[in-house]
Every structure is written in structure tokens, then in C-alpha cells.
């Protein structure tokens, strides 16, 4: 019992299947048994009520024929017998006719005529008590009251014979008396007793006053009682159901036209149940046999359904836990066999998808590591560029300071030339000083040329580094394109996996969640790659800007070198001219003018060089700022690459729980 209760509580598809099959088996047989039972009941009920009505009509017809025959005789005698016959000499003839009639009709106990003068003529003559007055009898009074109509007395027991008789009387045509006969009802009573309705049903007759005339168990003359009397005496004929002594019965009845008596037939309703029970018992036996045979078939069918279902459930549980190597073995070509094959195909598809995802994840992880390494190298290169730019900026500042020094020297030279013009007496001394100053200026110019060449070399190196950075940025862009492709492929594979899982229904729901997570990781990888690509594009644009600025600085430096060369040539000329002053005093004024003009040109050139140096310093500062921004971008790229690597590791951890090889 405990195992059965445990089986009932355990959720299983077999229980609703058993209930459904039993319902399909039991309901039709049960309904058929019920309707067969009801049909047999109704048919038997109709047969019994029809039998009751037929017997009642037959009994009434027998009574009616007998009464009509006797009424005809009474009518005949009431027409032929008159006062003259009763009082005349033909009394003997009348008695002879009475004798003849009673002889021919055994059911007539006596026939007699009574006159107004209280004389009675009867056959057979059994003697009349002295002082007997026939005119005081009910049969006489009723006949006189009805005037020409035959009347029937209440049935009574004949004292002489003990038979139940009824007196039929009618007033003579001339009104001089009444003719009457005693009708023995034994034949009617016997016919009533012979009637059987069903097994225990019977017929009975009552008078208009509810007194029994004929009944198998109740004494004649007993007044009937019960609810049935109200229905019987409220209509001329019909049928109804009633309760008698606590038992259900049915009755059919009719009313005799001549007497108003009630002829009825009744039977117990329980007879219907007794007669219908074999049909019900047969139906129950058929139902039990059907349940046994159907139960065996149902168990076989349910086992054929649940056995492959259990295999499917067990395999689905293993697949949901990550074991994709499990294979369902259902040896059947029906829908379950097809479902098993489809399940195996789904498992194979999942193994293929997981394998591709694992390979893609490994590629993403490898690419992420390469991207991280490239980002680290780029960061180092950017740091070197930043240091080189800072060194270049320091050299440029030193060059600016030296240019200011040169400008100061040129100012002093201009003052010296002015003094030469003012004081010819000190020309020699001034010439010597000018020669020294020219020599010093030449050295400064040569030094400036050296610094400008150094700046030019630094700019070229910076330009080469920036170009290399641009090339590496392009390489990073290519790597990002590869990552984007891998992310798109991973996303596509995740979508395919989700589709396959959706086809699998409930069994693929767990894998659908995994596929959705894989797809989200792929989308995040693609988004991160796009962000990195955007940062790389910004770096490329900034590198291009830096490259353009380096090219501009390189061009300006080259122009500065040309101007410096010109300045060196001018100082050389000054130096040569100052050495010739002592010998060429006559050309002093012209030389002074030339020196003044040359010094002005040199001063202008130095100012130009100073302006160029300042512009170069500003450009270098911009390049330094761009390099710092690039360094920050590379750090972001490195961080994104690390995030992508972490996501790849998470995806690897997720896919590792799936077993795709035996």
C-alpha cells in the first residue's frame, strides 16, 4: 500500500495515460451498460404496463359483455311483463320463462318481479318470509327512481350460496312493478384471479364507493384506502406510480361504463429491477473482462511509451550536466525512434558547435595575448618617443638661448661698427676687436650650425619613430579586424547554438542559456574591439598630425641651416675684412657700411632663426602632448585587451563543462 501511495505521489506521465486509457475503456462500456440496463428497464416497464392495461381492458370487456347480456334480458322482461301478467292467470307462464332463462344462464342465481302491491314472483322460489315487502328494498327503490333505466346494486354476498352477486333491476314499462335478477360474479372473480401481471402483479375490481369486489388478498366489501384511490377515482382511466406499504408500485385502471366500477391492474416496480438485473450483471461482467484485457494492453502500451521516454529523460539529464557524448539507443522505427535519432543528431550538432566555440575562444585568447603584447610594445615605443621629444625640446631651448646670445653679440658688433665710424682714430683697435668679435661670432655660428644639424637629426629620428608607430598602429588595426571577425563568428556560432537549443525544446534550455552567454561575450568582445579600433584610429590621426608637424619642423630646420650657413659665410667675410682693415684704411668707410649692412642682415637672420626655434619649441610641445595622449590610449588598449582576455577565459571556463569527446 505504501509503495502504491508513493507511486501515486511520484510525478509520471504513466498515471495520466493510465487514467485516460481506463476512462476510454470504462466510460463507453459503463455508458453502454447503463443504457442497456435502462433500455431493458423501460422496455419491461412498457411491457408490464401494457400487460396491465390489456388485462384490465380484457377483464372490463368480460364484465361489460356479461352485464350487457343481462341488461338486455332485463330490458326484454321489462317490456313484456306488465300488470296484467303479474295479476292475471299467466303467472305460471312467467315463472316458466324465468325457469328457462336461469337454466340457460348458470350465472343467474334468481330472477324475480315485484308488483306495486308488494307481491313477489321469483324463480327459483326459495320461499319468502311472511310480511316481506319487496318495495322497500334498495333494488326496487333505485329502479323506480331511475324510471326505465337498468340499475345495479352494490355487490353483496348471497346468504344462501355465499357467492358474490349483484342485483340488476328495472322498472316495468307500465310502471306496475320492477323486474330484477341476481347475477353471480364468480366467473368475473375467477377471471380476475387468473390475471398475473409480471410475477406478483394482479388485477382487482372496486365499486364506485371504493369497496372491493374482487381482490386476491382483501375480502370483498372492504373499503379501499390509500393515495392510489384519489388518482383512480379522479379519472376514468389511466396509469400512475404510487407507494403501497413502503414499496413502489404501478397501476393501470379503467372504469366500467354500466356500473361505474373500477377495474385495475397493479405490479411492483421492483420486478423491473429483478428482470433488468441480468442485463446489468452481464454488462458488469463484460466491463470487468474489458478492464482486465484492456489493463494488460494499457500496461503494454504505457511501457512502450515510458521506456523510451525514460531513456530520453536520462540522456537529457546527462546532456544538461555537460556530457554531450551520451547517445540514445532506441530500437524502434516509430516516433520515439525518430525522436531518439533527432536527439542524437542534436547532441552531435551541440558537440560540433561547442568544439568550434572552444577553438574560437582559444583563438580569441591567443589574439588577446598578442594584442596585449603589441599594446605593451607600442606603449614602450611611445615612451621612447616621448623621451626623445623631451630631449629635442631641451635642445631647442638651448638653441634659443644661444640664438639670443648671438643676437646680443650682433648688437655689440653694431655698436662697434658705429664706434668705428665715429672714431677713426681707434680704427685699428676697433678693427682688432671686430676681428676678435667676428672670430667669436663665426665660432658661435658654427656651433649654431652644429646644434641645428643635431636638431635636424633628432627631428628625423622622431619622424622615423612616428612612422614606425603609424605602421604598428596599422598592424594593431589588422589584429582588431581579426578579433572583430572572430567575435562575429563566435556570435554567429552562438546564435546557431541557440537555434539548435530552441529546437531541442526543454532539453536544450540549459544549453540555450550557455549559448546566450557565449553570444553576449562575443558581442562584448566585438564592442571592445570596436572601442580599441576607435582609439587606434584616433592615435593614427594624431600620429599623422605629429608626422606632419615633424615634417614642417624638419623643413624649418633645413631653412635655419641654410640661414646659418649664410650667417657663417657673412661672419667669415667679416673676419676676412677685419683682417684687411689695417691695410685698407682708405676703404674704411665703404667697409664699415658693408659691415653695418651685413650686421643688420645677420641680426635679421638671427631673429628669424629665433622665431623658428620658438615655433619649433611650440610644435615639439604639441607633439609631446600628442605622445602623452597616445600613451594614455595605448594604456586603454592594453586594458581592453586584458578585459578581452578575461572574457575569453570566462568563456573557456563555461565551455569546459561540456564533454564532447568520449
From Swiss-Prot:
Gene3D superfamilies tied to this protein: 6.10.340.10, Methyl-accepting chemotaxis protein, PAS domain
Domain Methyl-accepting transducer: 374-610
Pfam families with a match to the protein in the record: dCache_1, HAMP, MCPsignal
Keywords for this protein: Cell membrane, Chemotaxis, Membrane, Methylation, Transducer, Transmembrane, Transmembrane helix
Membrane topology: Multi-pass membrane protein
Domain Cache: 153-228
Chain positions found as Glutamate methyl ester (Glu): 370, 629, 636
Purpose: Chemotactic-signal transducers respond to changes in the concentration of attractants and repellents in the environment, transduce a signal from the outside to the inside of the cell, and facilitate sensory adaptation through the variation of the level of methylation. All amino acids serve as attractants in B.subtilis, they appear to cause an increase in the turnover methyl groups, leading to methylation of an unidentified acceptor, while repellents have been shown to cause a decrease in methyl group turnover. The methyl groups are added by a methyltransferase and removed by a methylesterase.
Domain of life: Bacteria
UniProt keyword Transmembrane helix present: yes
Signal peptide: none
Annotated GO CC locations: plasma membrane
Name of the protein described by the UniProt record: Methyl-accepting chemotaxis protein TlpB
Species, as recorded: Bacillus subtilis (strain 168)
Alphabetical GO biological process terms: chemotaxis; signal transduction
Amino acid at each position: 500500500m505504501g509503495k502504491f501511495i508513493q507511486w501515486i505521489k511520484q510525478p509520471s506521465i504513466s498515471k495520466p495515460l493510465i487514467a485516460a486509457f481506463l476512462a476510454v475503456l470504462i466510460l463507453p462500456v459503463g455508458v453502454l451498460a447503463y443504457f442497456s440496463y435502462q433500455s431493458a428497464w423501460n422496455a419491461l416497464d412498457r411491457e408490464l404496463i401494457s400487460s396491465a392495461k390489456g388485462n384490465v381492458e380484457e377483464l372490463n370487456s368480460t364484465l361489460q359483455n356479461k352485464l350487457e347480456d343481462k341488461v338486455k334480458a332485463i330490458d326484454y322482461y321489462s317490456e313484456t311483463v306488465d300488470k296484467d301478467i303479474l295479476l292475471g292467470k299467466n303467472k305460471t307462464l312467467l315463472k316458466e320463462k324465468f325457469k328457462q332463462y336461469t337454466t340457460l344462464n348458470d350465472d343467474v342465481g334468481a330472477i324475480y318481479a315485484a308488483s306495486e302491491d308488494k307481491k313477489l314472483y321469483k324463480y327459483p322460489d326459495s320461499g319468502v318470509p311472511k310480511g316481506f315487502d319487496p318495495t322497500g328494498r334498495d333494488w326496487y327503490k333505485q329502479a323506480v327512481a331511475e324510471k326505465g333505466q337498468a340499475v345495479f346494486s352494490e355487490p353483496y354476498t348471497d346468504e344462501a350460496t355465499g357467492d358474490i352477486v349483484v342485483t340488476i333491476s328495472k322498472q316495468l314499462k307500465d310502471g306496475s312493478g320492477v323486474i330484477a335478477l341476481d347475477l353471480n360474479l364468480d366467473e368475473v372473480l375467477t377471471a380476475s384471479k387468473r390475471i398475473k401481471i409480471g410475477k406478483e402483479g394482479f388485477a382487482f375490481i372496486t365499486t364506485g364507493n371504493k369497496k372491493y369486489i374482487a381482490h386476491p388478498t382483501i375480502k370483498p366489501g372492504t373499503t379501499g384506502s390509500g393515495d392510489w384511490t384519489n388518482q383512480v377515482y379522479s379519472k376514468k382511466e389511466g396509469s400512475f406510480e404510487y407507494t403501497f406499504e413502503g414499496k413502489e408500485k404501478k397501476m393501470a385502471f379503467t372504469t366500467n361504463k354500466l356500473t361505474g366500477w373500477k377495474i385495475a391492474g397493479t405490479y411492483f416496480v421492483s420486478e423491473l429491477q429483478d428482470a433488468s438485473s441480468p442485463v446489468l450483471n452481464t454488462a458488469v461482467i463484460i466491463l470487468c473482462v474489458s478492464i482486465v484485457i484492456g489493463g494488460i494492453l494499457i500496461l503494454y502500451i504505457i511501457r512502450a511509451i515510458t521506456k523510451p521516454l525514460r531513456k530520453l529523460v536520462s540522456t537529457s539529464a546527462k546532456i544538461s550536466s555537460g556530457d554531450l557524448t551520451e547517445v540514445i539507443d532506441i530500437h524502434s522505427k516509430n516516433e520515439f525512434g525518430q525522436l531518439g535519432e533527432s536527439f542524437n543528431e542534436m547532441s552531435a550538432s551541440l558537440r560540433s558547435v561547442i568544439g568550434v566555440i572552444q577553438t574560437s575562444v582559444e583563438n580569441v585568447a591567443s589574439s588577446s595575448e598578442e594584442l596585449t603584447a603589441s599594446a605593451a610594445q607600442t606603449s614602450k615605443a611611445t615612451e621612447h618617443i616621448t623621451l626623445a621629444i623631451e630631449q629635442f625640446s631641451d635642445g631647442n631651448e638651448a638653441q634659443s638661448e644661444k640664438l639670443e646670445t648671438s643676437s646680443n653679440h650682433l648688437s655689440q658688433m653694431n655698436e662697434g661698427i658705429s664706434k668705428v665710424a665715429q672714431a677713426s682714430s681707434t680704427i685699428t683697435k676697433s678693427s682688432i676687436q671686430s676681428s676678435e668679435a667676428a672670430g667669436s661670432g663665426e665660432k658661435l655660428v658654427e656651433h649654431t650650425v652644429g646644434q641645428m644639424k643635431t636638431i635636424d637629426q633628432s627631428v628625423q629620428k622622431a619622424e622615423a619613430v612616428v612612422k614606425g608607430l603609424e605602421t604598428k598602429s596599422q598592424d594593431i588595426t589588422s589584429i582588431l579586424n581579426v578579433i572583430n571577425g572572430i567575435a562575429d563568428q563566435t556570435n554567429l556560432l552562438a546564435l546557431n547554438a541557440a537555434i539548435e537549443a530552441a529546437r531541442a525544446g526543454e532539453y536544450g534550455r540549459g544549453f540555450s542559456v550557455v549559448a546566450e552567454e557565449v553570444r553576449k561575450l562575443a558581442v562584448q568582445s566585438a564592442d571592445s574591439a570596436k572601442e580599441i579600433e576607435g582609439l587606434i584610429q584616433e592615435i593614427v590621426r594624431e600620429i599623422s598630425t605629429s608626422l606632419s608637424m615633424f615634417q614642417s619642423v624638419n623643413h624649418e630646420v633645413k631653412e635655419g641651416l641654410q640661414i646659418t650657413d649664410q650667417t657663417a659665410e657673412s661672419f667669415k667675410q667679416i673676419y676676412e675684412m677685419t683682417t684687411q682693415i689695417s691695410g685698407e684704411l682708405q676703404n674704411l668707410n665703404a667697409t664699415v657700411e658693408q659691415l653695418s649692412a651685413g650686421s643688420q642682415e645677420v641680426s635679421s637672420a638671427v631673429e628669424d632663426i629665433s622665431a623658428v626655434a620658438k615655433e619649433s619649441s611650440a610644435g615639439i610641445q604639441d607633439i609631446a602632448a600628442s605622445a602623452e595622449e597616445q600613451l594614455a590610449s595605448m594604456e586603454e588598449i592594453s586594458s581592453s585587451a586584458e578585459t578581452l582576455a578575461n572574457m575569453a577565459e570566462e568563456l573557456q571556463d563555461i565551455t569546459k563543462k561540456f564533454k564532447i569527446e568520449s
